[in-house]
Amino acid sequence: MDVKRIKRWQAFRIRGERQRYINVYEEMVKLTDKLNKSVDAIVVEGRRDLITLRRMGISKEIITAHEIKHRDLRGKRIAVLTDFDSHGEKLNKEISKFIESAGGKVKQVYREMFCGIALKRGIRQIESMRKTLRESELMVFNSGCWK
């Protein structure tokens, strides 16, 4: 390959990567907005997950898994955002059963949406999404593509 073709290919690859970051960033912003409007509380596994969601812009009540038994859940719409590995799946089922038995309504659709975004970037933990969001913000705002 000649030098011009190599440079063109590299520029195309960089634009493609930048566009993927922009898409991930936009999806995360939209999902954060939906969560803030549609649920009363969010349950996560631990403190790092809580911090990650706060930094992503979640303003609703965030409850860690070990605190959930001490909360009044009656009539609340709750999203359960555990990790996307086998342990997280099992914990998600246990927490969801507990919430429903306590009179709450579990909104599973948000876990599925978060999982979709995370798996596109190879992420299996909620706390790792903070790094992806930061990378996406840098790519979006440094590229001049943000409107």
Language-model-derived ranges and their functions:
Residues A41-I42, A79:
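Short glycine-rich phosphate-binding loop at a beta-alpha junction
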